[in-house]
């Protein structure tokens, strides 16, 4: 009788090509997503060594990091030039490399273009039980549909392009179980912020986290993708949520998803992708969903999380000297004083978007708060950036764009946008941004930018009041 296995172990075992004496395994990669920032050197390496792409049919290229979110075509439909030379060069390289190596390429002006981690599941290219890699740290996002997905470096991008495999050490396993019902105003983003604050930014180091429990199962696929997206912020290699009927309903009929008898066979296999009764994890964390409130970050690490009803902590309250020093440094950068009520912190900028929170459910949540309201006079810059052209079209069909525009926010084209300072969307130095993205590192949204991570509804609430606000106060 085989021993009970976790979901991670099942997917791992199914992809082992070769096991080595030191425990390292050669793993087959089912799907490879490529974008413009981490791929130029990889393609150059292939070209220099005379190699081809081993499985172009398992590879999909999408530009997302550097693309501007302002209009990309003029009135005549001609493509507008990219102002930044480095960005223009990277985008041009991907546009040249993908067809040269026989890789499917979604053009920057194609209707289905978007953030790679939104496009993958949306197109059905990402599937349960698959191994998925991308030269991007937030590849863990695809774990929301039950895929083992993780980010890789540029040299590994080249290796996967050439061989469709990677040499990897197996990870430890960790369960984060969230049981019970969440309260009003609490979203998937609040759940993962709370988890990150609980386990810490290094809590999952060396592990793959499986998110379980009734609160996780109750989430939509959009919510599950948000959870897995930020597994890396808890230090984990990847995040996983077991596929179920919600997953199958989401994927059915998508362009790259299996069809007909292949679909039936796939679902039959996907149903086996659950952790066996009796399987053990290396680490287990249990969280009561009732303890989770609308949350916000105060510092420069994703673990710096408090409820919106809380206050800025005093560095002296940290017993660990390194954390005490980090907290003091964070507060100096963020321009905050210990004891300040989070609801008294003003914000000048609002960003609703990123691979964490730019799907249709996220935009609906923000629009529900903004409907019939206007952004506060103190908010200088507020943008809504859909995760893909298909999300944008759906939002416009539902009239969400009009709600955002009428509220005084800008409605943009799809892309990574202000999540990271690699395109024109940057937060000015010394100013704050209520952001639905995943990282609040020093300079992440621009040199000197001060980031507060929140949910889409919380970002919308901040837009209305001009300060960090408990969205529950604005809910009907």
From Swiss-Prot:
Its EC number is 4.2.1.33. GO terms for molecular function: 3-isopropylmalate dehydratase activity; 4 iron, 4 sulfur cluster binding; metal ion binding. [4Fe-4S] cluster binds at residues 355, 416, 419. It catalyses: (2R,3S)-3-isopropylmalate = (2S)-2-isopropylmalate. Its cofactor is [4Fe-4S] cluster. InterPro entries: 3-IsopropMal_deHydase_lsu, Acnase/IPM_dHydase_lsu_aba_1/3, Acoase/IPM_deHydtase_lsu_aba, Aconitase_4Fe-4S_BS, Aconitase_4Fe-4S_dom, IPM_dehydratase_rel_enz, IPMI_cat. It comes from the Bacteria. PROSITE patterns: ACONITASE_1, ACONITASE_2. Keywords: 4Fe-4S, Amino-acid biosynthesis, Branched-chain amino acid biosynthesis, Iron, Iron-sulfur, Leucine biosynthesis, Lyase, Metal-binding. Binds 1 [4Fe-4S] cluster per subunit. The keyword Lyase applies. Belongs to the aconitase/IPM isomerase family. LeuC type 1 subfamily. Heterodimer of LeuC and LeuD. Catalyzes the isomerization between 2-isopropylmalate and 3-isopropylmalate, via the formation of 2-isopropylmaleate. This is 3-isopropylmalate dehydratase large subunit. It comes from Sphingopyxis alaskensis (strain DSM 13593 / LMG 18877 / RB2256) (Sphingomonas alaskensis). The gene is leuC.
């Amino acid at each position: 009788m085989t021993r009970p296995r976790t979901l991670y172990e099942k997917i791992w075992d199914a992809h082992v090509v070769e096991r080595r004496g030191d425990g390292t395994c050669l793993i087959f990669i089912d799907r490879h997503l490529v974008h413009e920032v981490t791929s130029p050197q990889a393609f150059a390496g292939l070209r220099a060594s005379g190699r081809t792409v081993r499985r172009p049919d398992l590879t999909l290229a999408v530009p997302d990091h550097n693309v501007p979110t302002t209009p990309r075509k003029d009135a005549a439909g001609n493509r507008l030039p990219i102002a930044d030379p480095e960005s223009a060069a990277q985008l041009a390289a991907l546009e040249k490399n993908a067809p040269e190596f026989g890789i499917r390429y979604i053009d920057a002006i194609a209707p289905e273009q978007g953030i790679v981690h939104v496009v993958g599941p949306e197109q059905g290219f990402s599937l349960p039980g698959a191994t998925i890699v991308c030269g991007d740290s937030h590849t863990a996002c695809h774990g929301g549909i039950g895929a083992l997905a993780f980010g890789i470096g540029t040299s590994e991008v080249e290796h996967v392009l050439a061989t469709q495999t990677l040499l990897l050490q197996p990870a430890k396993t960790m369960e984060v179980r969230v049981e019970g019902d969440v309260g009003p105003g609490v979203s998937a983003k609040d759940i993962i912020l709370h988890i990150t604050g609980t386990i810490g930014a290094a809590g999952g180091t060396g592990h793959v986290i499986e998110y379980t429990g009734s609160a996780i199962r109750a989430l939509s696929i959009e919510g599950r993708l948000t959870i897995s997206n930020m597994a890396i912020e808890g230090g984990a290699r990847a995040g996983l949520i077991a596929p179920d009927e919600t997953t199958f309903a989401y994927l059915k009929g998508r362009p790259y998803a299996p069809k007909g008898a292949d679909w039936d066979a796939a679902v039959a296999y996907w149903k086996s992708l659950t952790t066996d009764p009796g399987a053990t994890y290396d680490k287990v964390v249990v969280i009561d969903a009732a303890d989770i409130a609308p949350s916000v970050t105060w510092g420069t690490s994703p673990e710096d999380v408090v409820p919106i009803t809380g206050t800025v902590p005093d560095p002296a309250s940290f017993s660990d000297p390194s954390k005490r020093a980090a907290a003091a440094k964070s507060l100096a950068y963020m321009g905050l004083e210990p004891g300040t009520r989070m609801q008294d912190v003003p914000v000048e900028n609002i960003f609703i978007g990123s691979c964490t929170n730019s799907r249709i459910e996220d935009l609906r949540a923000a629009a529900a708060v903004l409907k019939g309201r206007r952004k506060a006079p103190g908010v200088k810059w507020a943008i809504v950036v859909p995760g893909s052209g298909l999300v944008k079209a759906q939002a416009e069909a539902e009239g969400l764009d009009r709600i955002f525009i009428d509220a005084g926010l800008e409605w943009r084209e799809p892309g990574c946008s202000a999540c990271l300072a690699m395109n024109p969307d940057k937060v000015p130095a010394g100013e704050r941004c209520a952001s639905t993205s995943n990282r609040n590192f020093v300079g992440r949204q621009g040199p000197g930018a001060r980031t507060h991570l929140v949910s889409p509804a919380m970002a919308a609430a901040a837009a209305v009041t001009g300060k960090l606000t408990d969205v529950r106060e604005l809910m009907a």
